Amino acid sequence: MPEESSKSSSSGLVAKNITRSFKDNLVVRKVSLRVDRGKVVGLIGPNGAGKSTCFGMLSGIIKAESGDVLIDGISVTNLPIHIRARRGLSLLPQETSVFTGLSVLDNLKVASELHQTRPTKRGKDGTIDNLLIQFGLKEIEERRGKFLSGGEKRRLELARLLVSSPRYVLLDEPFAGVDPISINEIKIHISSLAGDNIGVLITDHNAADILDICDNVYVMKDGAIIFEGDPAAVAADETVKSVYLGN
């Protein structure tokens, strides 16, 4: 029998009524959302809304108490994070995951070894070298991680995500610790992920930073989804504007 527990005809990364509590505190309440390949989807809300817990349940770091998580119609709710990664789901955590003692190039090589992939078979047209070029890292490939700027670290982390050829990626606060100029560069790279038919779910404490790259947006408050729509609808909603966009 395969590892998957159930199948459906649906595609996409899908959460169905996922719920989680900590110490009798209901943190996430029956959240449902969908990320299709080739789309960028935003998840916004104030601190404590439950966004990171949702990311944890989607990635497998946190177990959902109820509900279901599916990748292309296959339930992965009871599968650990490394099995979900094999199913095509990768997570970029909020805290940097760069190996500070290794060079940029070696960070990518280690990722390749961890995913049991061959470096000559990764990247847009086949190699780690292409990832270095794609993410503007070629000229600093020998620089160790501890000497990278916040923006360079994020670009390296995005490049490492592609080593495993994911179908879906979760980006948790990808602009944290990044200067405004680098934020714009990273936005371009995130949009390029969707252009490569990867589904992206992104959250950030500053909703205005991600609305311009999203196709669809979910708004969370007190552990529940309270609004869903395209960026224009989100930006036009008075409650969303006052609470989340600071207008």
Where are these regions (language model features)?
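Conserved ABC ATPase "signature" region
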Residues: 121-140, 187-191, 239
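The feature captures the beta-strand-to-loop junction immediately N-terminal to the Walker
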Residues: 44-46
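Conserved ABC ATPase signature
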Residues: 144-148, 152
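Helix-to-loop junction immediately C-terminal to a conserved catalytic motif
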Residues: 59
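ABC ATPase NBD coupling module
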Residues: 75-95, 121, 125, 234-238
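Catalytic Walker B motif of ABC-type/P-loop ATPase nucleotide-binding domains
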Residues: 169-173
